[in-house]
Amino acid sequence: MLPVVATTSTVHRGGHARFGVAACGALPSPVVTAFTLAAVLQKILIANRGEIAVRVIRAARELGIATVAVYSDLDRNALHVRLADEAFALGGQSAADSYLKTEAILDAIRQSGADAVHPGYGFFSENADFARAITEMGVAFIGPPPEAIEEMGDKVSSRRAAERGGAPIVPGTTEFARSADEIVAFGEDNGWPIAIKAAFGGGGRGMKVVQDAASVADAMASAQREAKNFFGRDEVYVERYLTWPRHVEVQLVGDQHGDIVWVSTRDCSAQRRHQKLIEEAPAPALPDGVEEAMGEAAVKAAKAVGYYNAGTVEFIFQDGDFFFLEMNTRLQVEHPVTEAITGIDLVEWQILVASGEPLPMTQEEVLATRRGHAIEVRINAEDPAGGKFLPSPGTITKLATPDGFGVRFDSGYESGDEVSQFYDNLVGKLIVWGKDRDTAIARTIARSRTPSSRVSPPRSPPTWRSCAIPTSPPSSTRRNGSRNASTCPAPLRRRPRPNPLPRVRPRPSRSSSAA
């Protein structure tokens, strides 16, 4: 039984139970770790916003740890600000003028007296200079050491680290590409197509697939421009491009005592524009022994750079072989599917590791917790018109979230909140667990029929945004009883029974878990 530390805040009471860790419904019970709060951090500042900030706040609250939010001018009334014990303004509207202002965040740390900082994902989560500045203040950084971030943040040096650890890598360069002729020579030696990639990038940005030698010069220049615009550096490298691989990643956690465990695999192959949309755990239909080999290779790659805290090693898998792709030195957006099949609270483990605690479980104990299958669907505020799926900022006039057995919904928004054009358009994540993959798929499809959101763009009539899941449009999209086919599919309707017997409808069940 964990001791409870009382806090003075009352904002945590209320109707937010469907979000975050406590919204897991009937997912596997969390693994409770025995420890004393005397050794744990006392106040955590979350240098982020949206659903990941809410996720960290809820995990910290379960440990009795006070939380501090930071916010831009646009996020003054955001959910993560409402939930935190304290909140400090960063000023500005865009990310560059707020959440990426190092000095403003460092000042908030000093004023709040926080003894730890959780970076979430995005923003400063993989910035070694930011992590170093935090630790030099005598404040715990809830993440890996700066040196590991530096080595794994550079795709070229991370390939070298993976080789040192014995992980197989895609044929490619372990140095920056200096000229188009060098890339052409690589393509001729290793075969086409090839991929030119930003050395300091990710998410598909700064990546160009080249089919032949004649296209190399233009593709290299384009990749360098894009890399410079998005990541501030234009170095690129080249590797063999696999035409139809699966994207399989390994979640791991290490402590500051040299122990690292891999928790599960995840399949993230369902992508759009090289960005993940649907993830599942464990990765299905891998040949015998491949998952274990991936896990062991991930641990070796992490140990090669002295890694600790949560991280993810990404592999590509094709024709029975897997290759190291990169390492994300942070918590992933899709981490809940791993939590769903293991019952392990990964954010809690992050906090414990940052406190200097050893890992609470051995590798064998971690693998023994796994059961069932989980799927995550990302819900984005987008306009599907014309198949473009462009970001659709505005006010969420209605947010109806799925619930039920094995269902969890993580979000940084509630009805009435604003989705800003200045930030990521991720509204939430639907996480569904089933006793096997078929059950998880069926349950995901069933829960995806819940209307997710209705967004009113600024200075425009209210319109329906499908958020990438099947929904029915509101009455405002209908004229003379007809449906506007360009918005959403028609809702499923049951035909009325002839002379139906009266039925007693059960009351909708309320979530019994406290957020």
Predicted feature descriptions by range:
Residues 4-8:
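Intrinsic low-complexity, disordered N-terminal segments enriched in polar/charged/small residues
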Residues 13-17, 25:
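Short hydrophobic alpha-helical segments enriched in small aliphatic residues
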Residues 19, 257, 319, 436-439:
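Residue-level recognition of short loop/turn positions
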Residues 32-313, 317-334:
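N-terminal beta-alpha lobe that positions the nucleotide/phosphoryl donor
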Residues 298, 336-515:
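Catalytic cores of soluble metabolic enzymes centered on carboxylation/carboxyl-transfer
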